[in-house]
Protein backbone atom coordinates (compact mmCIF):
# COMPACT_ATOMS: atom_id res chain seq x y z
CA UNK A 1 0.00 0.00 0.00
CA UNK A 2 2.83 2.39 0.88
CA UNK A 3 4.66 1.59 -2.35
CA UNK A 4 1.51 2.28 -4.34
CA UNK A 5 1.04 5.65 -2.63
CA UNK A 6 4.70 6.47 -3.23
CA UNK A 7 4.39 5.64 -6.94
CA UNK A 8 1.27 7.80 -7.16
CA UNK A 9 3.11 10.75 -5.62
CA UNK A 10 6.03 10.34 -8.02
CA UNK A 11 3.56 10.21 -10.90
CA UNK A 12 1.89 13.43 -9.73
CA UNK A 13 5.29 15.11 -9.41
CA UNK A 14 6.43 14.09 -12.90
CA UNK A 15 3.08 15.16 -14.36
CA UNK A 16 3.32 18.60 -12.76
CA UNK A 17 6.92 19.03 -13.92
CA UNK A 18 5.82 18.17 -17.46
CA UNK A 19 3.01 20.75 -17.27
CA UNK A 20 5.50 23.37 -16.09
CA UNK A 21 7.93 22.64 -18.92
CA UNK A 22 5.15 22.74 -21.51
CA UNK A 23 3.67 25.85 -19.85
CA UNK A 24 0.21 24.32 -19.71
CA UNK A 25 0.02 25.62 -16.14
CA UNK A 26 0.68 29.35 -16.35
CA UNK A 27 0.20 32.35 -14.12
CA UNK A 28 1.77 32.89 -10.71
CA UNK A 29 -1.43 32.14 -8.80
CA UNK A 30 -2.22 28.88 -10.61
CA UNK A 31 1.37 27.66 -10.34
CA UNK A 32 1.56 28.57 -6.63
CA UNK A 33 -1.72 26.87 -5.85
CA UNK A 34 -0.73 23.71 -7.73
CA UNK A 35 2.69 23.67 -6.00
CA UNK A 36 1.12 24.02 -2.55
CA UNK A 37 -1.38 21.23 -3.30
CA UNK A 38 1.42 18.93 -4.47
CA UNK A 39 3.51 19.56 -1.36
CA UNK A 40 0.46 19.03 0.85
CA UNK A 41 -0.09 15.63 -0.76
CA UNK A 42 3.58 14.77 -0.22
CA UNK A 43 3.36 15.62 3.48
CA UNK A 44 0.10 13.69 3.77
CA UNK A 45 1.01 10.50 1.89
CA UNK A 46 4.79 10.59 1.63
CA UNK A 47 7.10 8.25 3.53
CA UNK A 48 8.95 10.24 6.17
CA UNK A 49 9.71 9.48 9.78
CA UNK A 50 10.84 12.84 11.14
CA UNK A 51 11.04 16.51 10.23
CA UNK A 52 14.58 16.25 8.84
CA UNK A 53 13.56 13.53 6.41
CA UNK A 54 10.57 15.60 5.28
CA UNK A 55 12.68 18.75 4.88
CA UNK A 56 15.18 16.87 2.72
CA UNK A 57 12.38 15.48 0.54
CA UNK A 58 10.71 18.87 0.10
CA UNK A 59 14.06 20.42 -0.88
CA UNK A 60 14.58 17.77 -3.58
CA UNK A 61 11.05 18.28 -4.92
CA UNK A 62 11.49 22.04 -4.84
CA UNK A 63 14.71 21.90 -6.87
CA UNK A 64 13.02 19.72 -9.49
CA UNK A 65 10.09 22.12 -9.80
CA UNK A 66 12.29 25.22 -9.93
CA UNK A 67 14.54 23.66 -12.57
CA UNK A 68 11.46 22.91 -14.67
CA UNK A 69 10.49 26.61 -14.76
CA UNK A 70 13.28 28.80 -13.28
CA UNK A 71 11.50 32.12 -13.87
CA UNK A 72 8.35 31.10 -11.98
CA UNK A 73 9.70 32.51 -8.73
CA UNK A 74 6.49 31.66 -6.90
CA UNK A 75 7.41 27.94 -6.97
CA UNK A 76 10.51 28.57 -4.87
CA UNK A 77 8.52 30.90 -2.63
CA UNK A 78 5.91 28.24 -1.85
CA UNK A 79 8.61 25.63 -1.24
CA UNK A 80 10.39 27.99 1.19
CA UNK A 81 7.11 28.73 2.98
CA UNK A 82 6.42 25.01 3.44
CA UNK A 83 9.97 24.42 4.72
CA UNK A 84 9.49 27.32 7.13
CA UNK A 85 6.20 25.80 8.31
CA UNK A 86 7.81 22.39 8.92
CA UNK A 87 10.62 23.90 10.97
CA UNK A 88 8.29 26.13 12.97
CA UNK A 89 5.89 23.32 13.83
CA UNK A 90 8.78 21.05 14.82
CA UNK A 91 10.30 23.78 17.01
CA UNK A 92 6.92 24.35 18.66
CA UNK A 93 6.72 20.68 19.62
CA UNK A 94 10.39 20.65 20.60
CA UNK A 95 10.02 23.67 22.88
CA UNK A 96 6.81 22.34 24.40
CA UNK A 97 8.54 19.08 25.31
CA UNK A 98 11.57 20.96 26.62
CA UNK A 99 9.33 23.15 28.80
CA UNK A 100 7.16 20.25 29.95
CA UNK A 101 4.06 21.37 28.03
CA UNK A 102 1.48 19.12 26.38
CA UNK A 103 1.91 18.28 22.68
CA UNK A 104 -1.38 16.39 22.42
CA UNK A 105 -3.48 19.30 21.11
CA UNK A 106 -3.62 17.71 17.63
CA UNK A 107 -5.55 14.55 16.98
CA UNK A 108 -3.96 12.08 14.56
CA UNK A 109 -6.80 12.50 12.08
CA UNK A 110 -7.11 16.28 12.36
CA UNK A 111 -5.31 16.82 9.08
CA UNK A 112 -7.81 14.53 7.32
CA UNK A 113 -10.72 16.66 8.52
CA UNK A 114 -8.94 19.91 7.75
CA UNK A 115 -8.04 18.77 4.25
CA UNK A 116 -11.64 17.77 3.62
CA UNK A 117 -12.95 21.09 4.90
CA UNK A 118 -10.39 22.95 2.80
CA UNK A 119 -11.58 21.18 -0.37
CA UNK A 120 -15.22 21.90 0.47
CA UNK A 121 -14.48 25.60 0.92
CA UNK A 122 -12.45 26.25 -2.23
CA UNK A 123 -15.01 28.79 -3.43
CA UNK A 124 -15.26 30.58 -0.12
CA UNK A 125 -12.74 33.39 -0.50
CA UNK A 126 -14.32 35.73 2.03
CA UNK A 127 -11.37 35.67 4.40
CA UNK A 128 -10.81 39.04 6.04
CA UNK A 129 -7.43 40.67 6.31
CA UNK A 130 -7.27 40.52 10.08
CA UNK A 131 -7.64 36.73 10.11
CA UNK A 132 -4.79 36.40 7.63
CA UNK A 133 -2.63 38.69 9.74
CA UNK A 134 -3.24 36.40 12.71
CA UNK A 135 -2.33 33.36 10.62
CA UNK A 136 0.87 34.93 9.43
CA UNK A 137 1.78 35.99 12.94
CA UNK A 138 1.78 32.30 13.80
CA UNK A 139 4.87 31.96 11.64
CA UNK A 140 6.37 35.38 12.33
CA UNK A 141 7.04 34.64 16.01
CA UNK A 142 10.41 33.15 15.06
CA UNK A 143 11.90 36.57 15.86
CA UNK A 144 10.31 36.54 19.34
CA UNK A 145 11.24 33.07 20.57
CA UNK A 146 13.66 32.52 23.43
CA UNK A 147 16.15 30.77 21.15
CA UNK A 148 16.84 32.76 17.97
CA UNK A 149 17.64 31.15 14.61
CA UNK A 150 21.38 31.24 15.28
CA UNK A 151 20.88 29.04 18.35
CA UNK A 152 18.90 26.43 16.41
CA UNK A 153 21.92 25.01 14.59
CA UNK A 154 22.30 22.30 17.25
CA UNK A 155 18.71 21.12 16.59
CA UNK A 156 18.85 18.32 14.03
CA UNK A 157 15.05 17.93 13.52
CA UNK A 158 15.33 14.14 13.88
CA UNK A 159 13.18 13.68 16.97
CA UNK A 160 9.76 12.17 16.24
CA UNK A 161 6.45 13.60 17.46
CA UNK A 162 3.20 11.66 16.86
CA UNK A 163 1.15 14.83 16.27
CA UNK A 164 3.66 16.61 14.02
CA UNK A 165 2.09 15.56 10.71
CA UNK A 166 -1.34 16.86 11.75
CA UNK A 167 0.17 20.19 12.80
CA UNK A 168 2.10 20.59 9.52
CA UNK A 169 -0.96 19.67 7.45
CA UNK A 170 -3.06 22.19 9.34
CA UNK A 171 -0.55 24.96 8.64
CA UNK A 172 -0.24 24.08 4.94
CA UNK A 173 -4.03 24.19 4.70
CA UNK A 174 -3.88 27.68 6.17
CA UNK A 175 -1.33 28.61 3.50
CA UNK A 176 -3.68 27.35 0.76
CA UNK A 177 -6.58 29.24 2.36
CA UNK A 178 -4.39 32.36 2.28
CA UNK A 179 -3.78 31.84 -1.45
CA UNK A 180 -7.48 31.37 -2.11
CA UNK A 181 -8.47 34.54 -0.28
CA UNK A 182 -5.65 36.88 -1.29
CA UNK A 183 -7.42 38.56 -4.24
CA UNK A 184 -10.39 39.47 -2.07
CA UNK A 185 -8.14 40.58 0.78
CA UNK A 186 -6.24 42.94 -1.53
CA UNK A 187 -9.45 44.20 -3.14
CA UNK A 188 -11.01 45.02 0.24
CA UNK A 189 -8.39 47.75 0.70
CA UNK A 190 -9.30 49.52 -2.56
CA UNK A 191 -11.55 52.15 -0.94
CA UNK A 192 -8.63 53.37 1.18
CA UNK A 193 -6.45 54.07 -1.86
CA UNK A 194 -8.79 55.14 -4.69
CA UNK A 195 -10.88 58.30 -4.41
CA UNK A 196 -13.69 59.73 -6.50
CA UNK A 197 -12.85 61.54 -9.75
CA UNK A 198 -9.30 60.18 -9.82
CA UNK A 199 -7.59 58.99 -12.99
CA UNK A 200 -5.78 55.68 -12.61
CA UNK A 201 -3.26 54.21 -15.05
CA UNK A 202 -2.43 50.52 -15.30
CA UNK A 203 -0.89 48.10 -17.78
CA UNK A 204 -0.85 44.39 -18.49
CA UNK A 205 -3.41 41.87 -17.30
CA UNK A 206 -3.44 41.25 -13.55
CA UNK A 207 -6.36 39.56 -11.81
CA UNK A 208 -5.37 41.22 -8.53
CA UNK A 209 -5.45 44.70 -10.08
CA UNK A 210 -8.72 44.00 -11.90
CA UNK A 211 -10.50 42.92 -8.72
CA UNK A 212 -8.96 45.86 -6.85
CA UNK A 213 -10.34 48.36 -9.38
CA UNK A 214 -13.72 46.64 -9.64
CA UNK A 215 -14.12 46.67 -5.87
CA UNK A 216 -13.29 50.39 -5.76
CA UNK A 217 -15.80 51.07 -8.56
CA UNK A 218 -18.63 49.84 -6.33
CA UNK A 219 -18.32 52.99 -4.19
CA UNK A 220 -16.13 55.35 -6.21
CA UNK A 221 -16.41 56.99 -9.61
CA UNK A 222 -13.07 57.21 -11.41
CA UNK A 223 -11.39 56.80 -14.78
CA UNK A 224 -8.88 54.15 -15.79
CA UNK A 225 -6.26 54.48 -18.54
CA UNK A 226 -5.00 51.07 -19.65
CA UNK A 227 -1.72 50.69 -21.54
CA UNK A 228 -2.16 48.04 -24.24
CA UNK A 229 1.21 46.38 -23.43
CA UNK A 230 2.42 45.53 -26.93
CA UNK A 231 3.26 43.09 -28.41
CA UNK A 232 1.29 40.75 -26.11
CA UNK A 233 -1.65 43.21 -25.99
CA UNK A 234 -2.57 41.97 -22.51
CA UNK A 235 -3.83 45.45 -21.72
CA UNK A 236 -6.68 45.00 -24.18
CA UNK A 237 -8.04 42.14 -22.07
CA UNK A 238 -7.94 44.33 -18.98
CA UNK A 239 -9.66 47.21 -20.78
CA UNK A 240 -12.48 44.93 -21.96
CA UNK A 241 -12.93 43.43 -18.49
CA UNK A 242 -13.07 46.84 -16.79
CA UNK A 243 -15.46 48.21 -19.41
CA UNK A 244 -17.84 45.31 -18.79
CA UNK A 245 -17.79 46.31 -15.12
CA UNK A 246 -19.05 49.80 -16.14
CA UNK A 247 -15.73 51.50 -15.36
CA UNK A 248 -14.81 54.49 -17.54
CA UNK A 249 -11.85 52.96 -19.42
CA UNK A 250 -9.49 54.34 -22.06
CA UNK A 251 -7.00 52.14 -23.94
CA UNK A 252 -3.75 53.78 -25.08
CA UNK A 253 -0.61 52.62 -26.87
CA UNK A 254 2.65 52.14 -24.99
CA UNK A 255 4.17 55.15 -26.75
CA UNK A 256 1.48 57.44 -25.28
CA UNK A 257 2.37 56.70 -21.65
CA UNK A 258 4.53 59.78 -21.07
CA UNK A 259 2.06 62.12 -22.78
CA UNK A 260 -0.88 60.85 -20.71
CA UNK A 261 0.93 60.62 -17.38
CA UNK A 262 0.42 64.30 -16.55
CA UNK A 263 -3.34 63.62 -16.28
CA UNK A 264 -2.92 60.65 -13.95
CA UNK A 265 -3.35 60.72 -10.15
CA UNK A 266 -2.07 57.23 -9.42
CA UNK A 267 -0.50 54.23 -11.18
CA UNK A 268 -1.74 50.82 -10.01
CA UNK A 269 0.01 47.73 -11.36
CA UNK A 270 0.58 44.05 -10.66
CA UNK A 271 3.91 42.24 -10.72
CA UNK A 272 5.44 38.88 -11.52
CA UNK A 273 7.72 38.90 -8.47
CA UNK A 274 8.77 41.18 -5.61
CA UNK A 275 12.53 40.99 -5.09
CA UNK A 276 14.39 41.10 -1.79
CA UNK A 277 15.29 44.80 -2.15
CA UNK A 278 11.70 45.84 -2.91
CA UNK A 279 12.23 45.94 -6.67
CA UNK A 280 9.92 44.31 -9.20
CA UNK A 281 10.15 41.76 -11.96
CA UNK A 282 7.10 42.87 -13.92
CA UNK A 283 5.56 42.88 -17.38
CA UNK A 284 7.68 44.42 -20.12
CA UNK A 285 6.88 48.12 -20.33
CA UNK A 286 6.52 48.58 -16.57
CA UNK A 287 9.92 50.29 -16.25
CA UNK A 288 8.99 52.91 -18.85
CA UNK A 289 5.72 53.49 -17.02
CA UNK A 290 7.51 53.80 -13.67
CA UNK A 291 10.09 56.29 -14.96
CA UNK A 292 7.35 58.44 -16.51
CA UNK A 293 5.40 58.32 -13.24
CA UNK A 294 8.44 59.41 -11.24
CA UNK A 295 9.08 62.32 -13.62
CA UNK A 296 5.51 63.55 -13.10
CA UNK A 297 5.57 62.74 -9.34
CA UNK A 298 2.77 60.19 -9.70
CA UNK A 299 2.77 57.47 -6.99
CA UNK A 300 3.08 53.84 -8.10
CA UNK A 301 1.04 51.31 -6.14
CA UNK A 302 1.71 47.58 -6.58
CA UNK A 303 -1.09 45.11 -5.80
CA UNK A 304 0.30 41.68 -5.01
CA UNK A 305 0.02 38.67 -2.77
CA UNK A 306 2.92 37.85 -0.49
CA UNK A 307 3.40 34.52 -2.26
CA UNK A 308 5.29 36.59 -4.86
CA UNK A 309 7.81 37.77 -2.27
CA UNK A 310 11.16 36.41 -3.46
CA UNK A 311 14.45 36.43 -1.47
CA UNK A 312 16.55 37.04 -4.60
CA UNK A 313 18.08 40.22 -6.02
CA UNK A 314 17.90 41.64 -9.53
CA UNK A 315 20.27 44.48 -10.38
CA UNK A 316 19.57 45.18 -14.05
CA UNK A 317 17.20 44.46 -16.93
CA UNK A 318 19.00 41.27 -17.97
CA UNK A 319 18.80 39.54 -14.59
CA UNK A 320 15.97 36.99 -14.41
CA UNK A 321 14.64 37.98 -17.81
CA UNK A 322 13.24 35.91 -20.62
CA UNK A 323 13.11 36.70 -24.33
CA UNK A 324 10.14 35.83 -26.50
CA UNK A 325 10.01 35.46 -30.26
CA UNK A 326 10.56 38.70 -32.24
CA UNK A 327 7.93 37.33 -34.61
CA UNK A 328 5.27 38.90 -32.39
CA UNK A 329 6.13 42.34 -33.75
CA UNK A 330 8.47 41.70 -36.71
CA UNK A 331 7.16 39.84 -39.74
CA UNK A 332 9.38 37.08 -41.11
CA UNK A 333 9.33 38.47 -44.65
CA UNK A 334 10.69 41.80 -43.36
CA UNK A 335 13.67 40.15 -41.66
CA UNK A 336 15.64 39.64 -44.89
CA UNK A 337 16.05 43.43 -45.18
CA UNK A 338 17.49 43.68 -41.65
CA UNK A 339 20.81 41.85 -41.95
CA UNK A 340 22.67 43.74 -39.21
CA UNK A 341 19.74 44.27 -36.85
CA UNK A 342 19.38 42.33 -33.59
CA UNK A 343 15.76 42.20 -32.45
CA UNK A 344 14.77 41.45 -28.84
CA UNK A 345 11.42 40.80 -27.22
CA UNK A 346 11.93 40.82 -23.43
CA UNK A 347 9.17 39.34 -21.29
CA UNK A 348 9.94 41.27 -18.11
CA UNK A 349 11.24 44.61 -16.86
CA UNK A 350 13.15 45.19 -13.66
CA UNK A 351 11.77 48.13 -11.68
CA UNK A 352 14.05 49.50 -8.96
CA UNK A 353 12.54 49.95 -5.46
CA UNK A 354 12.99 53.73 -5.53
CA UNK A 355 10.36 53.86 -8.30
CA UNK A 356 7.74 52.07 -6.17
CA UNK A 357 5.66 54.01 -3.65
CA UNK A 358 3.60 51.31 -1.92
CA UNK A 359 2.86 47.59 -1.91
CA UNK A 360 -0.73 46.57 -1.17
CA UNK A 361 -0.63 42.94 -0.07
CA UNK A 362 -3.12 40.47 1.34
CA UNK A 363 -2.07 41.49 4.87
CA UNK A 364 -1.98 45.26 4.32
CA UNK A 365 0.15 48.01 2.85
CA UNK A 366 3.96 48.08 3.06
CA UNK A 367 6.74 50.36 1.88
CA UNK A 368 9.50 48.85 -0.29
CA UNK A 369 11.94 49.35 2.58
CA UNK A 370 9.90 46.93 4.72
CA UNK A 371 10.34 43.97 2.37
CA UNK A 372 13.46 42.75 4.19
CA UNK A 373 11.38 42.34 7.36
CA UNK A 374 8.72 40.32 5.55
CA UNK A 375 11.44 38.00 4.26
CA UNK A 376 12.45 37.24 7.85
CA UNK A 377 8.84 36.56 8.80
CA UNK A 378 8.02 34.26 5.89
CA UNK A 379 11.20 32.31 5.12
CA UNK A 380 13.96 30.57 7.02
CA UNK A 381 17.41 32.10 6.54
CA UNK A 382 18.94 28.67 5.88
CA UNK A 383 16.76 28.11 2.83
CA UNK A 384 17.60 31.56 1.47
CA UNK A 385 21.35 30.97 1.87
CA UNK A 386 21.08 27.59 0.13
CA UNK A 387 19.41 29.25 -2.87
CA UNK A 388 22.27 31.70 -3.15
Curated annotation (Swiss-Prot):
Positions of transmembrane segments: none
GO biological process: cytoplasmic translational initiation; translational initiation
Keyword Protein biosynthesis: yes
Keyword Protein biosynthesis appears in the UniProt entry: yes
Annotated spans, Disordered: 109-133
Keyword field: Cytoplasm, Initiation factor, Protein biosynthesis
Gene Ontology MF term list: guanyl-nucleotide exchange factor activity; translation initiation factor activity
Bias (Low complexity) ranges: 116-133
Intracellular or extracellular location(s): Cytoplasm, Cytosol
Cellular component, GO annotation: cytosol; eukaryotic translation initiation factor 2B complex
Record-stated family: Belongs to the eIF-2B alpha/beta/delta subunits family.
Functional note: Acts as a component of the translation initiation factor 2B (eIF2B) complex, which catalyzes the exchange of GDP for GTP on eukaryotic initiation factor 2 (eIF2) gamma subunit. Its guanine nucleotide exchange factor activity is repressed when bound to eIF2 complex phosphorylated on the alpha subunit, thereby limiting the amount of methionyl-initiator methionine tRNA available to the ribosome and consequently global translation is repressed.
Subunit structure: Component of the translation initiation factor 2B (eIF2B) complex which is a heterodecamer of two sets of five different subunits: alpha, beta, gamma, delta and epsilon. Subunits alpha, beta and delta comprise a regulatory subcomplex and subunits epsilon and gamma comprise a catalytic subcomplex. Within the complex, the hexameric regulatory complex resides at the center, with the two heterodimeric catalytic subcomplexes bound on opposite sides.
Protein name, entry field: Translation initiation factor eIF2B subunit beta
Taxonomic lineage of the native organism: Eukaryota, Amoebozoa, Evosea, Eumycetozoa, Dictyostelia
Gene that specifies this protein: eif2b2
Amino acid sequence: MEKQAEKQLEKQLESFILHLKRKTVVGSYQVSRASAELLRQWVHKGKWGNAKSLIDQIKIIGKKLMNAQPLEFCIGNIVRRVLFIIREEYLTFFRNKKNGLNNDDYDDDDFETTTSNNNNNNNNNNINSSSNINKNNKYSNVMLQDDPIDDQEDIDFTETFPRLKAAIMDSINELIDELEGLHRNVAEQAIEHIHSNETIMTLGCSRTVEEFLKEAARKRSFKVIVVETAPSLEGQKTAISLSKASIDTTLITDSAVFAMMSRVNKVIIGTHAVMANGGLIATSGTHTLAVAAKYHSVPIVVCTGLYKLCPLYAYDQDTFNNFGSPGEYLKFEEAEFLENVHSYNPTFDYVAPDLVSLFITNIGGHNPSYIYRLLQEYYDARDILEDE
